[in-house]
Amino acid sequence: MKEQTKEKITLESLGEFGLIKHLTKSIKLKNKSSLKGVGDDAAVLDFGKKKALVTTDILLEGIHFDLTYMPLRHLGYKAAMVNFSDICAMNGTPTQLLITIGVSKRFALEQIEEIYAGIYMACEQYNVDVVGGDTTSSLTGLTLSITCLGEADENKIVYRSGAKVNDLVCVTGDLGAAYMGLQLLEREKMVFQGQKDPEFQPDFAGKEYILERQLKPEARKDIIENLAKAKIVPTAMMDVSDGLSSELLHICNQSGVGCRIYEEKQILEKAQKCTQLPHQPVS
């Protein structure tokens, strides 16, 4: 018996408000600071005695991600996570999220559901409420913009400008894995596009770690929680998204100090020392 292919639902058939209703129908608020979420002209939040933190990131198809190898669910997860990371870098806790998405007619409802599934997965894991957003049509590919709100006690907020002479420079994880994962994906994409064999599959064996660091990064909320338990407030902090040297330059410039880094002291996992690619994690 021939299996029937389920017909995909077009976004045009739903319309903007139908799409929003469909994507947000299962949202339940978890944070006390979320008084009103999706369904009104604006969200209503109450942070009480804490200070509100706000950050936003926009991801453009062809600039920040390539759908040739980026699964849509991973894209949604990563879009949320890069915003959570900014809040954590201020020594805060992410609490609310707003999602703005621009899509073209080439996307079906099921594909948009995959993006939102990734976002909701990230929010569930980090106890963040989706409280609003917007949808629109796009003529230039997929656009995904996330705004994240968080909270922190005023005396525990950590800025880039607080570094002092004789401070110790620390990195919470290893370096270079996400970049090496990107290089591997780009290499395999080129090989795949040059193949005539329809059965050809990219070779990612043994490279799962660096691929996950690129496609499914994690915000270091665990570090913020551990610092709080130890009653430690860093003098300066920021997330490393563009590389160690550029982020240190930001901190040094804003703090009016210099720094010295010892390459042999940096933590590098074996998975990042990939001899198949002409790069080094810290070069």
Please state what every model-predicted region is:
Residues 1-283:
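Helix-biased detector of long, well-ordered alpha-helical tracts
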